[in-house]
């Protein structure tokens, strides 16, 4: 169920290539202390973060978000094709969308210290954004992120072949299965194919029943996304980030995307090896992929709040 906000404003922003992007602004009831922009994950949409946005607004933050290309109301605004970024360079185009959306939001609502919060696919987009625009960011929070592995390189090559042979806009059952079929392996008493998302059965059921969630993305989408995975771990790209940018990596200890924590620490090590001075990791015991939807999500909220306030976590 969508939360009701007296202080919520919806926008449709036009990108430089003519694509329409659906975005939302949530206004705090008191003085604005900063700006947090939320980047949602694959196969979902921005409205799933309204509870988190409400919490952040109560703290005094201006909170904004948008639906990526091929997702949510952005997909509906552009012909209804889900799970497709662009005809070419889709990952970079989606990162550029973030920049253009933020530029327009800041023209409308002012320049405040900016924190980028990215979940899952959104965390990979945030990691690339930080490589290109770190001077415009005050902080970055990567939620449910993971490491790039040799399997992503293999998947990238396969997705490119599938895009050429079967069509770029064809839903990729093969890539979807290769990407997600193993995610429930360590979960006891599996009920649905999406149990890996969260331990809260009601949240999983809401995801399943949401028509804008859980769709199978296209061949070209998987090619674009894996291309992004490969690019963001290149040392020369990581070194583009200003060394003093604070980065928080948060994840569930039972999140398969982060390899149950191993991949998250690998990402942190890559940042530290590149000379970054302020990288923090926080794992939440017993939580899965969507930690801000877990039963004990307040633990996550509290850690984010303390980190934003420069307090020990």
Segments the model singles out, each with a brief description of its role:
Residues 4-30:
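N-terminal cap/lid segment of alpha/beta-hydrolase-fold proteins
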Residues 85-106:
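Alpha/beta-hydrolase active-site loop
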Residues 109-120:
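Alpha/beta-hydrolase fold nucleophile elbow
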Residues 126-212:
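Alpha/beta-hydrolase-fold enzymes
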Residues 274-313:
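Catalytic active-site module of serine/aspartate enzymes centered on a nucleophile-bearing elbow/loop
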């Amino acid at each position: 169920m969508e939360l009701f906000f007296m202080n919520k404003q919806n926008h449709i922003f036009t990108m430089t290539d003519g694509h329409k992007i659906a975005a939302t602004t949530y206004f705090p009831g008191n003085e604005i202390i900063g700006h947090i922009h939320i980047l949602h994950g694959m196969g979902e949409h921005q409205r799933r973060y309204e509870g988190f946005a409400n919490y952040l607004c109560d703290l005094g933050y201006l909170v904004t978000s948008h639906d990526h290309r091929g997702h949510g109301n952005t997909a509906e605004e552009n012909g209804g094709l889900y799970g497709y970024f662009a005809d070419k360079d889709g990952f970079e185009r989606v990162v550029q969308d973030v920049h253009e959306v933020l530029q327009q939001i800041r023209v409308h609502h002012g320049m405040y210290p900016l924190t980028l919060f990215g979940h899952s696919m959104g965390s990979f987009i945030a990691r690339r954004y930080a490589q290109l625009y770190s001077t415009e960011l005050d902080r970055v929070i990567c939620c449910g992120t993971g490491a790039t592995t040799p399997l992503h390189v293999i998947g990238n090559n396969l997705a490119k072949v599938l895009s050429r042979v079967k069509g770029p806009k064809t839903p990729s059952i093969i890539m979807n299965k290769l990407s997600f079929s193993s995610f429930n392996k360590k979960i006891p008493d599996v009920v649905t194919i999406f149990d890996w998302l969260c331990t809260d059965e009601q949240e999983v059921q809401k995801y399943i029943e949401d028509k804008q969630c859980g769709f199978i993305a296209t061949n070209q989408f998987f090619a674009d996304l894996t291309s992004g995975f490969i690019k963001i771990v290149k040392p020369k790209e990581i070194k583009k980030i200003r060394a003093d940018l604070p980065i928080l990596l948060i994840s569930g200890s039972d999140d398969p995307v982060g390899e149950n924590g191993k991949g998250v620490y690998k990402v942190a090590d890559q940042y530290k090896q590149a000379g970054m001075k302020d990288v923090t990791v926080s794992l939440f015991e017993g939580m899965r992929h969507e930690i801000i939807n877990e039963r004990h999500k307040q633990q996550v909220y509290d850690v984010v709040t303390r980190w934003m306030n420069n307090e020990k976590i």
